[in-house]
Amino acid sequence: MQASADQVERDILETQKRLQQDRLNSEQSQALQHQQETGSSLKEAEVLLKDLFLDVDKARRLKHPQAEETEKDIEQLHERVTQECAEYCALYEKMVLPPRRGIQGRLGTRAGAETEAGLRRPVWAGHGGAGGTDRGAQHRAEGDQRPRRAAAEPGGAGCRHHPEPIPRPTEGGVVARAEPGQPVHALQGCTWQLSALAEQQRRILQQDWSDLMADPAGVRREYEHFKQHELLSQEQSVNQLEEDGKRMVELRHPAVGPIQAHQEALKMEWQNFLNLCICQETQLQHVEDYSRILCPSSSPH
């Protein structure tokens, strides 16, 4: 346990240093340089903390004389990691949707209505939300209005296709059931999803979304594949994390404060991601309409 605790301490100190450096970069309007390393350190710390909590629980059951003192030390480490997770979100999440693009302003109201009730109403996937509404039918109806919507054009040249699907969590880690004495699983799950969503949005924003994109048909295929095969499972993971968090809050777990903070951060990041997906859908439709005007005999599909 001592070796793991020492590594967590090192991760905390390294994370603190990187956060301070990027905070200074942000104040000076410079690029943030340490997001990936900071996320990796926090992820490692949370995995180690999970094992430490299990070990100290075993020591307590065996009535080890230092179990209580060790548990206090681990709880202090956990509080520090949780605080750094909150600082990570506050520092890096603002990079996801740059205000200068106006994405949130143009689309926030419509997408916000989809997620305000607690992420229970999927935008796509054709299954019922609140009241049994067919969201797939709604999405098709919205498609008829796309040519009249203003184009949102995330800038930058990069890979043209939709991001690769995020890998599913491995056993025992990310989306674990929330039971008394096991807050780390839910917190780790939220942190993992926050990191994954931020990475997805970063990659989307780096794609070529100009009206003259090289391969709109290929981009459309990748995007439709994501909607049909990946979006629903990702939404289910987010919903499961929300259920786990609610369960622990209802059980009045001592870590209710950090749990609620992580839940709110995840809810906001998921809404941002849906907003950006709507931007993709809108811009793809505009590019396809533009191609049909230029070449009436061709089809983007």
Swiss-Prot record:
The family this protein is said to belong to: Belongs to the plakin or cytolinker family.
Lineage start: Eukaryota, Metazoa, Chordata, Craniata, Vertebrata
Positions of region (Disordered): 18-41, 118-166
Protein name: Envoplakin-like protein
Coiled-coil intervals: 1-88
Single Gene Ontology BP annotation: intermediate filament cytoskeleton organization
Biased composition regions of type Polar residues, renumbered to the chain: 26-41
UniProt feature, compositional bias: Basic and acidic residues: 136-151
A Pfam match: Spectrin_1st_PEPL
Keywords of the record: Coiled coil
Source species of the chain: Homo sapiens (Human)
InterPro entries linked to this entry: Plakin, Spectrin_PEPL/EVPL
PANTHER family, per database record: ENVOPLAKIN
